[in-house]
Amino acid sequence: MAQELDLELGLAPYDPWVLKKNLTESDLNNGFIILPKQDFEKIIRQMERGLVKNLGNGVEVKVHIIEEGPESDDYTLTLVKCRGNCMFRGGWYNMVKAKCYKPDDEIGLMWDKWSRRFLFHHIN
């Protein structure tokens, strides 16, 4: 019994952003952002066990913002798991204001396990 393999290659551009979200007024004004649960579960699997174990207490994480051109910024945020949801706070509001994000801006997020930090990008 032969099995068929699908060897068709696509020409879609590479998209590294595991988590994508369109920012809301609430995300921008409340001092925290709740991250989409299903997408964030993919990121948690890549993180160190000790870090994940302490999410209930809140852990400081580095966030490297990737910009077009030579500019980039680093921020320290608090990542917390509360009532089954993960959220950034403790630095989120300052980052939002410094980068002038607006409602409906799309952001992308991924975990860089080698440098143990988040990579963050303003997609559009």
UniProtKB/Swiss-Prot annotation:
Originating organism: Arabidopsis thaliana
Localization (cell): Nucleus
SUPFAM superfamilies in the cross-refs: DNA-binding pseudobarrel domain
GO CC list: nucleus
Gene3D superfamilies: DNA-binding pseudobarrel domain
InterPro entries xref list: B3_domain (IPR051442), DNA-bd_pseudobarrel_sf (IPR015300)
DNA-binding feature ranges: 18-124
Cysteines joined through disulfide linkages: none
Name of this chain's protein: Putative B3 domain-containing protein At1g51970
Key words of the record: DNA-binding, Nucleus, Transcription, Transcription regulation
One GO MF term: DNA binding
